A protein has these predicted regions:
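Non-catalytic cap/lid and distal C-terminal segments of serine-dependent acyl enzymes
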Residues: 1-280
Length: 280
């Protein structure tokens, strides 16, 4: 039940949560620094033939300038919505604080709605189409984003991590940075949610990208993180080993804890400073 006296809330996939923010976290607090803006954006999806929603973070100074920015697509989990990263995930405040501390470059962060139908698994292909055919073109039309591969990143948690793998490796020529939080190829270790039975295994479907040396050359970072108590730990480990087998250099870390926002916020704090870094 929502607290009617608490204005802070977060939309999940099927209900609302009341939020209580406990101060003290270095990069999650609301600090006296320049703040960007988070907008709720409606767009018409030609692939899904209906109006859809996403949240978009623009960094401090975006509205008053003409500069173009790199773009980071940040995907939510199966119990969440496009609102989740900017509310319970504190993504806007995290980015403000990282940018103010000069730990992360100013960037546009796009948080789309990962659910395209009643179930995430059965409708996964619909979201992938919506992402490539509608979300990316809409962002590049409406916002001053740099459109080359080296200035485009994607990451996601849980379901969003699986979507990052599906979209990222099917379109590896478009992304230089990929992050997978508490996720992997579902079913690869006999746990998690398996792929649809009428599809070949993920490794087979993506063989052209996995074994393409030209695509690997432009890929600057593949980053995985999972909690030691996460129910998808074996899935993450098996996915990392599979990618290494195909010659990918994967950064992998295991943290304390499980499948929780306590970890995912920390992963964003660690991942965002690695993006769009010319030294990589």
């Amino acid at each position: 039940m929502l607290d009617p006296r608490n204005p802070a809330g977060s939309e999940s996939n099927d209900n609302m949560w009341s939020l209580v923010v406990v101060p003290g976290a270095e990069f999650m607090d609301t600090k006296d620094v320049p703040h960007g803006a988070v907008a709720e954006v409606t767009y018409q999806s030609s692939s899904l033939k209906r109006a859809r929603r996403m949240h978009v973070y623009t960094p401090p100074g975006y509205e008053n300038g003409r500069k173009s920015y790199p773009v980071f697509y940040l995907l939510h989990g199966s119990s969440d919505s496009d609102d989740s990263w900017s509310s319970v995930g504190r993504a806007g405040f995290i980015m403000d604080n990282l940018i103010a501390a000069k730990k992360a470059k100013p960037m546009i962060v796009v948080m789309p709605a990962g659910h395209s139908g009643p179930t995430a698994i059965r409708n996964g292909k619909d979201f992938e189409r919506d992402f490539v055919e509608d979300i990316m073109p809409q962002i590049e039309k409406r916002y001053r984003v740099q459109t080359d591969r080296s200035n485009r990143a994607m990451a996601g948690l849980s379901m969003g991590g699986g979507q990052t793998l599906n979209i990222g490796f099917a379109n590896l020529d478009k992304f230089a940075y990929l992050g997978v939080f508490s996720s992997g190829v579902f079913g690869i270790a006999g746990g998690g949610r398996p792929a649809a039975t009428n599809e070949p295994p993920w490794e087979v479907r993506n063989k052209a990208s996995l074994d393409n040396p030209k695509l690997k050359k432009g890929l600057k970072l593949v980053w995985f993180a999972t909690g030691k108590d996460d129910f998808l730990l074996k899935t993450s480990r098996a996915t990392v080993e599979m990618l290494k087998k195909h010659g990918f250099s994967v950064v992998y870390k295991e943290s304390e804890g499980g499948h929780t926002w306590l970890n995912w916020r920390d992963y964003l704090i660690e991942f965002a400073p690695l993006l769009f870094n010319e030294s990589r």
